[in-house]
């Protein structure tokens, strides 16, 4: 007798020739996959019971069915192997893509952190300022020789590196304060480690001084050494240093660097050691030193307004916390109005008609824009006060363009 019962899985039971009649043997056959799915048509249990006389016949029949099933499944097994290999290749490719994307993202993040670490707005100010001062000693297009351009690039590079040193050493010294005032900066946010920042700072300063020494220009070497010392004294927290906590000393540092070092050290370098002419202090140079010094003093006062919260938390008494934000803002705006008024008078006294016109209109326009911008400042909003501070940097850039029309 042959008895079959349908169940949820395939489990044939049969008597083998060497078994006694009436015993049961369970045979579990593997389920096959058809294009990634189970062959549901074979997913049944078969209970096979054989007598002694027909056990051999039943066993052979089951084996024949197994062989037939195996033959029928060969094409599907072949497809299954192909699909498996294809899946492995896809997984490998996906992993490579993920690793490539991850490396690219990390690299771009580090490069952006380095860019922010250099304080690009100050670097742009250095490029504009040094370029403008380098043009002042020129008397004709014949002065624009290949040697002049090479010496200009070397001097500009030394200035940019020193400017970056001053900005980065300030961030290294202010990591904890910047976590409150400027959490987006690389060291404060953790995008760069303090060790990495310190290493970059040292490389910048040493490279800048090395370039200056290679140029063998005493005014340039002197100017960069003064710049280095003042930048260090401004930020480093050592006895008798960290001058940024003192409003007078902080303002003095910025006035000396931007108002004097920029103008006189680099002007004399280009005039005497690049062009080979005797030193002659010109009217535009004196005017540039005066008005840039005023703008620098204003920037030293305004930069503390958005940082007042962090300064108070760490016990620093900035001028805005002593006098009040509104009074400091008013003082800075009035100082710039006075400077632009003087600039208009000086421009009006010029014998160069085009220069007179440009100087009067240009400085009047800057004063008007300053007045409009000052009306929109929200002293209770740090983002607003910082935006106004950045606007003063734009006035700084513009002044280096206008000084060339004062003859």
From Swiss-Prot:
Its cofactor is Mg(2+). Residues 1-81 form a transit peptide. Its main location: plastid. It is an enzyme of class 2 (transferase). It catalyses: umbelliferone + (2E)-geranyl diphosphate = 8-geranylumbelliferone + diphosphate; esculetin + (2E)-geranyl diphosphate = 8-geranylesculetin + diphosphate. One of its GO terms (molecular function) is prenyltransferase activity. Its EC number is 2.5.1.138. Coiled coil: none annotated. It comes from the Eukaryota. Keywords: Chloroplast, Membrane, Plastid, Transferase, Transit peptide, Transmembrane, Transmembrane helix. InterPro entries: UbiA_prenyltransferase, UbiA_sf. Pfam families: UbiA. The chain crosses the membrane at residues 121-141, 184-204, 209-229, 279-299, 328-348, 352-372. It is a multi-pass membrane protein. It is found in: Plastid, Chloroplast membrane. One of its GO terms (cellular component) is chloroplast. Prenyltransferase specific for geranyl diphosphate as prenyl donor and coumarin as prenyl acceptor. Can use umbelliferone and esculetin as substrates, and with a lower activity, 5,7-dihydroxy-coumarin and 5-methoxy-7-hydroxycoumarin. No activity with 5-hydroxy-7-methoxycoumarin, bergaptol, xanthotoxol, p-coumaric acid, caffeic acid, 2,4-dihydroxycinnamic acid, kaempferol, genistein or homogentisate. No activity with dimethylallyl diphosphate, farnesyl diphosphate or geranylgeranyl diphosphate as prenyl donors. Belongs to the UbiA prenyltransferase family. This is Coumarin 8-geranyltransferase 1b, chloroplastic. It comes from Citrus limon.
């Amino acid at each position: 007798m042959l008895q079959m019962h349908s169940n949820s899985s395939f489990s044939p039971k049969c008597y083998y020739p060497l078994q006694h009649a009436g015993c049961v043997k369970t045979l579990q056959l593997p389920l096959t996959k058809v294009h990634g799915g189970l062959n549901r048509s074979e997913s049944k249990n078969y209970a096979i019971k054989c007598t002694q006389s027909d056990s051999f016949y039943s066993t052979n029949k089951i084996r024949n069915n197994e062989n037939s099933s195996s033959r029928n499944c060969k094409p599907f097994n072949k497809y299954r192997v192909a699909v498996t290999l294809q899946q492995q290749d896809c997984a490998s490719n996906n992993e490579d893509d993920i690793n490539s994307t991850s490396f690219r993202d990390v690299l771009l993040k580090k490069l952006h952190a380095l860019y922010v670490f250099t304080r690009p707005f100050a670097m742009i100010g250095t490029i504009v300022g040094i370029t403008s001062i380098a043009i002042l000693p020129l008397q004709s297009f014949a002065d624009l020789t290949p040697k002049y351009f090479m010496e200009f690039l070397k001097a500009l590079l030394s200035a940019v590196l020193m400017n970056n040193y001053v900005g980065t050493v300030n961030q290294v010294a202010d990591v904890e304060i910047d976590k409150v005032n400027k959490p987006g900066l690389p060291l404060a946010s953790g995008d760069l480690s303090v060790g990495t920042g310190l290493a970059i700072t040292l490389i910048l300063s040493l490279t800048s001084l090395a370039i200056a020494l290679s140029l063998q220009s005493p005014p340039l070497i002197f100017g960069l050494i003064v710049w280095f010392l003042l930048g260090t004294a401004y930020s480093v927290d050592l006895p008798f240093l960290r001058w940024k906590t003192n409003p007078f000393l902080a303002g003095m540092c910025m006035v000396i660097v931007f108002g004097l070092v920029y103008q006189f050290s680099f002007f004399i370098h280009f005039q005497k050691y690049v062009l080979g002419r005797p030193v002659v202090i010109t009217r535009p140079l004196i005017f540039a030193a005066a008005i840039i010094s005023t703008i620098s003093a204003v920037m030293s006062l305004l930069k503390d307004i958005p940082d007042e919260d962090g300064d108070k938390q760490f016990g620093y008494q900035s001028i805005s916390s002593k006098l009040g934000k509104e009074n400091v803002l008013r003082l800075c705006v009035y100082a710039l109005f006075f400077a632009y008024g003087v600039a208009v008078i000086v421009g009006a006294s010029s014998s160069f008609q085009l220069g007179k016109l440009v100087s009067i209109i240009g400085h009047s326009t800057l004063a008007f824009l300053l007045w409009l911008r000052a009306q929109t400042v929200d002293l209770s909003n740090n983002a607003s006060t910082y935006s106004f501070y950045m606007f003063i940097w734009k006035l700084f850039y513009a002044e280096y363009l206008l000084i060339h029309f004062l003859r």
